[in-house]
Regions:
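Conserved ABC ATPase "signature" region
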Residues: 96, 100, 108-126
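ABC transporter nucleotide-binding domain
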Residues: 175-266
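Helix-to-loop junction immediately C-terminal to a conserved catalytic motif
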Residues: 48
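Conserved ABC ATPase signature
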Residues: 130-137
Length: 309
């Protein structure tokens, strides 16, 4: 278990992380979302003991990261957003050296594990190719494979599928899930909403260095002005009778801009015929009706201070 207890990190006069409290459960995949500069990378580097928190406390399996940095470091593997691989070495040697530094495996065990992970990501044939000659996607695979081969207790991935094509993205998600299923706790920082939703057990949203929301993707969508949005186009010049929708407990908010009316709902799909009937009986001329589900992107924009369109 990983715990952030009112943790903060300041660089000069800049508070990169502020009063941050969160618990990450064992053997879960936590997706970390936030705008650029929100503090996601700083959080991960504090967890990995690269940065020391300037306030509060961070613990990993009950150990304070400041008091027990070496013990914590042995449990964590980090795949960085920008691949940190020695360009002179080939992929095989990069991974073999990484395992030598981070595990107690013997030479045969290391080589066996490296071969398995390189074959899994379709890099075996390029195992001796110097990484500086590789494409960005191939280098990113090598970076991710360092953690996949290490199989740490806590695995941290910063934008794990950046530069990857669609088949490679799907494969990387599968391998990250398998890492979790093997007993690792996984943290994935990403700017891709589909990645966060399809990969994560829970999603944490960070904004301006603070935790603003954390829950399962479905629960987050359900909390964002209901799980669905009903968009109506009514006759020009009509004042929308909001009060007639007060009878429906599922209606959470109503807004109108000219002849465009937006109704935020929970359980709106089953409620739609009743709402249309009620409005028609009140003399509202409805020109069009569109029901859409709130997406994780909507949730993200809402929690980071952007207006949903």
């Amino acid at each position: 278990m990983i715990g952030f207890d009112n943790a903060g990190k300041r660089f000069g006069t800049l508070d990169a992380v502020k009063e941050f409290s969160m618990t990450i459960q064992d053997e879960e995949i936590l997706g970390l979302l936030g705008p650029n500069g929100a503090g996601k990378t700083t959080l991960m580097l504090m967890m990995g003991t690269v940065y020391r928190p300037t306030s509060g406390k961070i613990s990993v399996n009950g150990m304070d990261v400041v008091q027990h940095p070496n013990d914590v470091r042995k449990m964590i593997g980090i795949a960085f957003q920008d691949p940190r691989v020695d360009g002179i070495l080939g992929a095989f040697d990069v991974l073999n050296w990484h395992l030598k530094m981070t595990t107690n495996l013997d030479k045969a065990q290391r080589e066996d594990r490296v071969e398995k992970v390189l074959r899994a990501v379709d890099l075996w044939e390029a195992r001796n190719k110097r990484t500086w000659l590789m494409s960005g996607g191939m280098r990113k695979k090598v970076e991710d494979c360092k953690v996949l081969a290490q199989r740490p207790k806590i695995a941290v991935f910063d934008e794990p599928t950046a530069f990857l094509d669609v088949p490679s993205r799907l494969l990387m998600w599968k391998m990250i899930r398998e890492l979790r299923d093997g007993g690792s706790t996984v943290i994935v920082a990403t700017n891709m909403m589909d990645e966060a939703e399809r990969l994560s057990d829970r999603v944490a949203i960070v904004n301006l260095g603070r935790l603003v929301a954390i829950d399962t993707p479905e629960q987050l969508k359900g909390k964002t002005k209901g799980g669905e949005v009903l968009e109506l186009t009514v006759g020009n010049g009509q004042e929308f009778p909001r009060e007639c929708l007060a009878q429906f407990s599922e209606v959470q908010d109503v807004s109108q801009e000219n002849n465009k009316v937006t109704v935020y709902l929970s359980g709106g799909r089953l409620l739609l015929p009743k709402i249309v009937e009620t409005l028609t009986n009140r003399g509202v001329k409805i020109d069009s009706v569109h029901l859409k589900e709130v997406t994780l992107e909507d949730v993200f924009l809402n929690y980071t201070g952007h207006k949903l369109e």
